[in-house]
């Protein structure tokens, strides 16, 4: 268990830190700075939901060990939904008003910082709704096949990004590839849960679809308020409130 878990963690670190090497190689230090800024935003977002997610992890392990399958799936679905909405509460206003926040935070904003941070927020949203699933897989102790699949997908990020950038792709290529591969790992993880643990994938997909609808409506409403209101400060407040209400 420890060895396979280590492989997955190393693949995650390689996928994240490899971005610095690739961006520095193709575009220099300035875009590396923008990527570092995006990673800081990622750390803030993860810190916001991590404490909540860690609170239900022992319960997941307990329910699996007790073979209380129905209660386990109910907890996993509920935890996924709440984790997503908690992060959504700060993700939507952050994306909509990201230029405003940067103007307060930094005197000089590096190029592509807005794009990088938007993509990293999307990445974090995918992770938030998937966290209870990988916690459940960890609780089973049967992670060999899962870790092999996950490691292969995550490490594929670097060569694929390098090839696309070599062919003239934009600087955001690395993070776009990361988001797409994270989505693929989410699909693989969900399918693995279905076939090896009996996870109710149909109910989970319906829940994910509802979350996506809420995300789109929240974003559109927040963006519409931002565009319509003349008072800049008021628009920021209402953007946050609209995401909370929805």
Residue map of PLM features:
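Alpha-helical transmembrane segments of multi-pass membrane transport and lipid-handling proteins
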Residues: 49, 73-128, 155-166, 216-224
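Membrane-interface helix-loop junctions in multi-pass transport and translocation proteins
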Residues: 144, 151-187, 194-195, 199-201, ...
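Interfacial/gating helices of multi-pass transporter permease domains
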Residues: 1, 22-43, 71, 110-115
